[in-house]
A protein has these predicted regions:
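Beta-alpha junction/loop-to-helix N-cap segments that form part of ligand/metal-binding clefts
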Residues: 68, 94-99, 112-200, 216, ...
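Extracytoplasmic "Venus flytrap"
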Residues: 63-104, 124-135, 160-161, 243-251, ...
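Extracellular/periplasmic periplasmic-binding protein-like sensory domains
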Residues: 310-387, 445-456
Length: 457
């Protein structure tokens, strides 16, 4: 958007044709930073109060993030490069694309500058069309090596899939570079959980013996436990069948659900991995139905054919058998893929869905308004964490004020009291996990994922 069109927008604001909030949202959606929007308003004679981001409902760096970190748009020290790596292909295109848009929005809100450096960003795609957009190990390794060999690169924002993180973390760790994820939830990346993580985890991912990895979303030991407690205690489900897509993430969260459901007193009639490349699950569902479960839990991501699993489940079992899945299914692609079979499905998520953020209002609601205007559709649930991940990185660069991987990593690990778009604050623990434990429960209603309530273990 040109400065001339901004002036037109300001004129509409003064004439009453456009409200101040709409002006801020439209200008931000066009890619202008908070500073440029404020400058344009002041140049047009709008008061300083009206020009402030808070007055317009725009969530700038000042309204979220760790306290006491000053921001400057000076770029005299040179350039810092930021990379991300997650799927941007096939069924994952919308999910990954929404996260990239959130990263770019956060960068724009900081004026594409931090700590005296100009910021550049490159989004890498670790997905492959042949795998329905799912990540590929060779690409993940190539991306990690590309990043550590770029002298301007200070931080890698990666990955979406926990299995991909297993590959990238050791490469970044050996190079002493920070890696931060907006979506990894497998516990074993940061901590050992009895019965749910592999032998040697997480230490085997950190060859230097020092931590370099963080995540801003709650891990699956929290999500799986909350899911089991809700199913058993609140829904009265006593007999579960547990499926997973045989990925690190899917098997991990399904195992936590299984273990916690049994600890509650529930019966697990069976637990197995399904073939994500199969074209039909009728025989599987017929065999499961014969065991008379009252709930089927499916640990999977959308690119691993869970929509077909649900369709075939519904063709064999009635609606009285509850379907429950984790955050890997909390996206429009899953609902669209399953079609009518998705109605009534329950899905958990480590946070709040976009509809809940809008209901809460404040910076989170404004974020949803802005990113929706940018995308032309409601964002993927995880996209909000893409924004927060970026703010963590930018504030660390501000604190370090040097082009130094070690100092930026140290600053990131010390993030505390971070004001979240979800409301409240969170801090990183010594393992690099967020101490936030918000788990949201959603239900598919009329083809849309609708927030129901917050749950806990």
């Amino acid at each position: 958007m040109s400065h001339e069109s901004i002036a037109d927008l300001v004129a509409k604001l003064h004439s009453g044709k456009v409200g101040r909030r709409e002006f801020m949202v439209r200008a931000a959606a066009a890619g202008l930073s908070v500073g440029l929007i404020g400058n344009a308003l002041r140049a047009a004679g709008v008061s300083a109060q009206d020009a402030s981001p808070a007055a317009g409902g725009l969530p700038p760096a000042a309204t979220i993030g760790a306290p006491g970190i000053a921001h400057t748009t000076d770029t005299s020290k040179g350039t810092i490069k930021l990379y991300s790596s997650w799927p941007l292909t096939g069924s994952m295109q919308g999910i990954g694309g929404d996260a990239v848009a959130s990263v770019k929005m956060a960068l724009a809100d900081f004026g594409n500058a931090a700590g005296g450096f100009a910021l550049e960003y490159e989004a890498l795609d670790d997905g492959v069309a042949a795998n329905n957009g799912g990540w590929e190990a060779g690409k993940e390794s190539d991306h990690a090596n590309k990043v550590i060999n770029d002298a301007d690169a200070m931080v890698h924002m990666a990955t979406y899939n926990s299995g991909a993180a297993k590959i990238a973390i050791p490469i970044l760790n050996a190079a002493g570079m920070a890696m931060i994820s907006y979506a990894n939830t497998y516990p074993g990346l940061t901590k050992a959980v009895e019965g749910a993580t592999e032998e040697g985890e997480p230490d085997k991912y950190y060859p230097t013996g020092k931590r370099n990895y963080m995540r801003v979303c709650p891990a699956d030991d929290i999500q799986g436990g909350a899911s089991a407690a809700w199913a058993y205690d609140e829904m009265g489900k006593k007999a579960a069948y547990v499926l997973d897509d045989q990925s690190l993430y899917g098997h991990g969260v399904a195992t936590v659900f299984k273990n916690q459901f049994e600890k509650k007193g529930g019966t697990v009639l069976g637990a197995e991995g399904y073939d994500a490349k199969a074209s039909d699950y009728q025989a599987l569902m017929t065999s499961i139905a014969a065991k008379n479960p009252d709930i089927v839990y499916v640990g999977a991501t959308v690119d691993q054919n869970p929509a077909k699993v649900l369709q075939d489940m519904r063709s064999v079992m009635g609606d009285e058998v509850l379907f429950l899945g984790p955050d890997g299914l909390n996206n429009a692609a899953f609902v669209q893929g399953a079609g009518e079979a998705a109605e009534g499905a329950y899905i958990t998520f480590g946070g709040y869905t976009p509809d809940k953020l809008k209901e809460l209002g404040g910076p989170g609601g404004d974020y949803v308004d802005r990113i929706t205007a940018t995308l032309g559709h409601a964002p993927d649930a995880y996209a909000v964490y893409g924004y927060e991940t970026t703010v963590v990185v930018l504030q660390a660069i501000e604190k370090a004020a040097e082009k130094d991987r070690a100092k930026i990593l140290e600053a990131m690990l010390k993030t505390e009291g971070f004001k979240s778009l979800l409301g409240g604050t969170w801090s990183f623990t010594e393992t690099g996990d967020t101490d936030s434990s918000i788990i949201g429960l959603a239900k598919v209603e009329n083809g849309e994922i609708k927030f129901q309530k917050a749950i806990s273990g």
